[in-house]
Amino acid sequence: MKKQHIINETFLDEILAQKLGTTYIPPTEIKDSDFDKAAKHFINLLLRADGLKPIKTAVVHPIDKESLLGAVRAAQFNVIKPILIGPQHKIESVAKVNDVDLENYQVINAEHSHEAAKKAVELAKKREVAAIMKGALHTDELMSAVVYKENGLRTERRISHAFLMAVATFPKPFIITDAAINIRPTLEDKRDIVQNAIDLMHIIKEDKQVRVAVLSAVETVTSAIPTTLDAAALSKMADRGQITNAVVDGPLAFDNAISLFAAEAKGISSPVSGNADILVVPDLESGNMLAKQLKYLGQAVMAGIVLGARVPIILTSRADPIDMRVISCVLASFIYNQTKAKLHNSSKSII
């Protein structure tokens, strides 16, 4: 008889129970909530990752419950092989409190969070890890090590962040970018932000048509609202091949991007309206507010990833639950395996 095990903390736990060979006992009250409906999109992503080899991942400063259990849970799903970097005594303490056996995980001692970030970047530069995962430290502290000119992980692309979102009221997952890294991006920055998101969506989507909506407050171009000028320029850059592999349209107000009815009511004819895969926001402030409004008021499920660096960086909010950290790890795995497939003859593979 299989050992009974109550796993009901996150929406991924029924799948994990099957993987561990335990009996899943669901919560007493089960409601088909908007959150549950949205979560199904991410469960499908997790199932698609089944069979991929776990990627070595440097977990930076995992000294609280969520960051440690997020890495451990992703390891249980065989998505990542975590290397825990931080004050060893603090990692061991939080592991003990949360009944985590560290025997199967490598721990690298680092006295402070900035030292942990530096060591993670060094491992990535040496190709000893395939991804970096943010733990209990500020985003700017981790990213300062990533973008450091001398020993960082910059590429020819602008580094940007993408939230993969799913809500019950929209038929498919979509990306919001950039809501975490670039505060007030220039037009040239936005070109890279858009291209990074397109490349990610092509990895995620089985339907290869990708549609990008460049958002502003209105759908007409006016010098009074400079973001409409950027949106129009980005659309033309896609026409000229400066942005590739997607249909890009803008400026579009949010309602026109996600609702065909709203677009038709305003007389807007766009191949993107009502079917956007990517929402490009004007700046970090508007994007961050949009993503968090969807999460807290719209019961959205979300995952976060940094793009454009030498390795994917799993970047979630310190308030994000464990399941969202796991899905963020899935995105990193998809990115790594896609890159590996393109370079399958390279001797630089680390797995």
From Swiss-Prot:
Compartment(s) of residence: Cytoplasm
Pfam families membership: PTA_PTB
PANTHER family xrefs: PHOSPHATE ACETYLTRANSFERASE
Pathway: Metabolic intermediate biosynthesis; acetyl-CoA biosynthesis; acetyl-CoA from acetate: step 2/2
Cellular component per GO, a single term: cytoplasm
Family: Belongs to the phosphate acetyltransferase and butyryltransferase family.
A GO term, aspect molecular function: phosphate acetyltransferase activity
InterPro entries: P_Ac_Bu_trans (IPR012147), Phos_Acetyltrans/Butyryltrans (IPR050500), PTA_PTB (IPR002505)
Domain of life of the native organism: Bacteria
GO BP terms: acetyl-CoA biosynthetic process
Enzyme class: transferase
Protein's name according to its UniProt entry: Phosphate acetyltransferase
Catalytic reactions on record: acetyl-CoA + phosphate = acetyl phosphate + CoA
EC number: 2.3.1.8
Keywords linked to the UniProt accession: Acyltransferase, Cytoplasm, Transferase
Predominant localisation class: cytoplasm
